[in-house]
Amino acid sequence: MSEQRIIRPTPISGFPEWTPRIRSVELRWLDHIRRGFERYGFSSVETPSVEVLDVLLSKGETSQEIYTLQRLQADADDSSDARLGLHFDLTVPFARYVAQHFNDLVFPFKRYQIQRVWRGERPQEGRFREFTQCDIDVINVDRIPLHFDAELPRIVHEVLTGLDIPAWTLNINNRKVLQGFYEGLGITDPLAVIRAVDKLHKIGADAVREILIDQAGLSSDQAAACLELAEIRGSDTTVVDAVAKLGVSHPTLTAGLDELGEVLDELSDLPSGSVVADLSIARGLDYYTGTVYEATFNDDPGYGSICAGGRYENLAGQFIRRSLPGVGISIGLTRIFAKLVSEGRITGGRFCPTDVLVVLPSDERRSAALAVAAQLRERGFNTEVYHQAAKIGKQIQYAVKKDIPFVWFPPFDDGRPHEVKNLATGEQVEADPASWNG
């Protein structure tokens, strides 16, 4: 008989997984984020992991980053799954969802969505092929008030401040500022410039200047003006004055500066430096039309954005004949969490949910031990019974290794009292499973 082939398990690059101890911290983070979103009245939504490819490609995402779905043993003429792909973000699926369920929703519709997404990127530090995003969006019929553009950064500030993460800054810009400035310079394809400027922090000013001149067709003076705009940064409305000094005028530019100033005013009560207007922030996706956000770690801005989003005027327009503008922002949970794990800032917490371990002195006592466990569970204590009869010391060691705080000793002889031991203090006392309070 031939030996069974052993498949050596190896990690898959770009697909992170955690030990139970680390995962317990991630779950607490997820619960904290969920509660933060719900405090502001956002409702939970979940969409399928897959969408029709036409939906995923409807807003300009590159097809190279989309994982398609097909059965391994699919027939050559079976195309039923050929047009399905894993979603690369949660915004486009959300737009499809709103259009599909339009008559069942109350507007403005405030939703949060915490799910995994997939992108066919080259794995590297801070970039994964499977990761968790935590999104909030507000979408409305015909018009969405600008104050929502300020509410979302406020929510993110509260949520991230409640997590033990390194200092970070949320940078804000407005696509109308960029588009109006570029059009005021006589640039005919502002989107091409926006995509180039979006790479500024990754490839540097010289490389962006080269793209602007060689690929976007700008003159040297136009490219210089675009880069000069991108250097403007400030935590208050003085950025508006700085743009005015560049001497470019356009109605769209004026509208964008007005919106940017209003959002900054509404966020002026947040701690100094936590929200900054940064006119280099562009966000390369085509569907953003107004306010855009991008947050980075202060001590490692090159790590990439940990939170991003923006305003869109008609994201659902290809799915329904209604105007449905919205604004959204997404927290990159996996990117933040993985950095802290790799740096040793997260070493894990109490990973086992068990509150009480009921020892099993003998197989004959299993029924009695199970009855004790049932009583404790009814009273709200997560309880497990040791899996087999064994020496008491071995069972206690099991509890210690799993961070179980209490060990319960049923009567070894009929008529004797129950006892419970607190492993943190070493105290062991008599207790009644029907009334014990922990």
Curated annotation (Swiss-Prot):
Q: Which PANTHER family match?
A: HISTIDINE--TRNA LIGASE, HISTIDYL-TRNA SYNTHETASE
**Which of the seven top EC classes does this enzyme belong to?**
ligase
Reaction catalyzed: tRNA(His) + L-histidine + ATP = L-histidyl-tRNA(His) + AMP + diphosphate + H(+)
Q: Please give a single GO biological process term from the UniProt record.
A: histidyl-tRNA aminoacylation
- Spell out the subcellular localization from the entry: Cytoplasm
Q: Which GO terms describe its molecular function?
A: ATP binding; histidine-tRNA ligase activity
Q: What gene name is given for the protein in this entry?
A: hisS
Q: Where is the signal peptide?
A: none
- Quote the InterPro entries the UniProt record gives: aa-tRNA-synth_II (IPR006195), aa-tRNA-synth_II/BPL/LPL (IPR045864), Anticodon-bd (IPR004154), Anticodon-bd_dom_sf (IPR036621), His-tRNA-ligase (IPR015807), HisRS-like_core (IPR041715), HisRS/HisZ (IPR004516)
UniProt subunit comment: Homodimer.
Q: Does the keyword ATP-binding apply?
A: yes
The EC code for this enzyme is: 6.1.1.21
Q: Which residues cross the membrane?
A: none
Q: Which UniProt keywords apply?
A: Aminoacyl-tRNA synthetase, ATP-binding, Cytoplasm, Ligase, Nucleotide-binding, Protein biosynthesis
Q: What is the lineage of its organism?
A: Bacteria, Bacillati, Actinomycetota, Actinomycetes, Streptosporangiales
Cited Gene3D superfamilies: Anticodon-binding domain, Bira Bifunctional Protein, Domain 2
Q: What is this protein called?
A: Histidine--tRNA ligase
The organism encoding this protein is: Thermobifida fusca (strain YX)
Could you tell me the superkingdom of the organism this chain comes from?
A: Bacteria
Q: Does the keyword Coiled coil apply?
A: no
- A cellular component annotation (GO) from this entry: cytoplasm
Which Pfam families is this protein grouped with?
A: HGTP_anticodon (PF03129), tRNA-synt_His (PF13393)
Return the similarity comment.
Belongs to the class-II aminoacyl-tRNA synthetase family.
